[in-house]
Amino acid sequence: MIEEIKEHVKRLLDEGTISGFLGLKDQHGTIVPHLYKTSDDLDDGFSIGATEGGAPARYPMASLIMTIATTYENGKVGVLLRGCDERALNELLRWNQIPEAADRIVRVGFACKKELAEAHECRKPFPDECIAGEKTEPVSNASLKELESMDVTGRLNYWLREFDRCIKCYGCRDVCPVCFCNVCTLEEDSLIRTGDLPPENPMFHLTRAVHMAGRCIDCNLCTEVCPAEIPLRTLYKKVAEIVNHG
């Protein structure tokens, strides 16, 4: 699959369709985002996130391309997208975050493997514009169903225990591909007191959860980066469901 994607991107660069490509690069065993400028650059560590003996590396590609596309003045720029990345990009477009650069973004999508889709309970593990990979079936959210089987008191106690582990690192906010506010509510001292660890329970996380309702694209990056391993994605999904459907 990686060779198929690489050759496709090389053609886009060589034909002048794009003048840059935001993808991933293996730098001494660490996968990082990288802006490729020429087709020859792709022969030096090009990656789609696979790591040796570990989970695939994932980044908020949509928010990264938003920054690049609005500042990159050398024509169109391509971007490597999973299904969740495409949903994030569509959400940023819906919120008018990249109006002047929207037509300069060329999507290069690929499908996630079944194992990754199942690990993240992905509802759509492939983008609409998919050039490589086998499209796998959506995965149901078993973790959400498990919580819904508890009574109200059980759910409350569960979340209070989870939130007590929070170290207020803001990792969930910083990695979120659709968190784009210039002024963050979570840094407003009138709402969330600064200096408190753990942050006020449950106000800190419920504030963010309500803020994400109608915007969360279900990528699970928040849970993946959380050093306290709080299942934030499950929280956001349920709050969004309540807000959207009552």
Language model features with spans:
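Iron-sulfur-associated redox domains of electron-transfer enzymes in respiratory
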Residues: 1-165, 173-178, 182
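Ferredoxin-type iron-sulfur electron-transfer modules in oxidoreductases and energy-metabolism complexes
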Residues: 143-163, 181-246
